[in-house]
Amino acid sequence: MKHGKNFTLGEYVIIKKPELVKVGNNVRIADFCRISSGGDGKYTFEMGDCSSLAAGVKVWLSSNDYVNELVTHSIPEVKEIQGNVRLGKYTGVGTNSVIMPGNDIPEGVSIGALSFVPSNYKFEPWTVYAGRPIRPIKKRNKENVIKTLRKAGYLKD
């Protein structure tokens, strides 16, 4: 796993194929998170600067579609949904949320606790999302976030 400065990894975190994981500066992956490559293991997970996964977040880079006759991961012929997952700068994912394959989460997005992010969801930057499945709740104030990070010493002018 490649990581930037001030990276914090919680306890009991499971990262399958850490060589496919890249995180930026000032990033936290809290306790009990799981990042699972599955499938053929070629898909990547990236976290931008000042982003975080709260406790218990699950990130899947591969999953079964569960709509055909063979609905078990032990059979290789099962159709899988696979894709990279990327979290942009200043993003946060709340406790026990689930992120499915193929998501590009843009700068400033915040995902509330216990949320479910379906594959290939279309996000708007600087927006708060929550729910099962997620939906937009409200906009975030980019200037206030940046100001707070600067004041805390995480960003330089």
Residue ranges and their predicted role:
Residues 122-148:
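Conserved beta-strand-loop-alpha-helix hinge in the C-terminal portion
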Residues 1-12, 155-157:
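Extended, small-residue-rich solenoid/repeat segments and analogous flexible loops
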Residues 11-104, 120, 132-133, 139-140:
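Flexible, glycine/small-residue-enriched loop-and-beta-strand segment within the central core
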Residues 104-120, 125-130:
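C-terminal/domain-terminus segments
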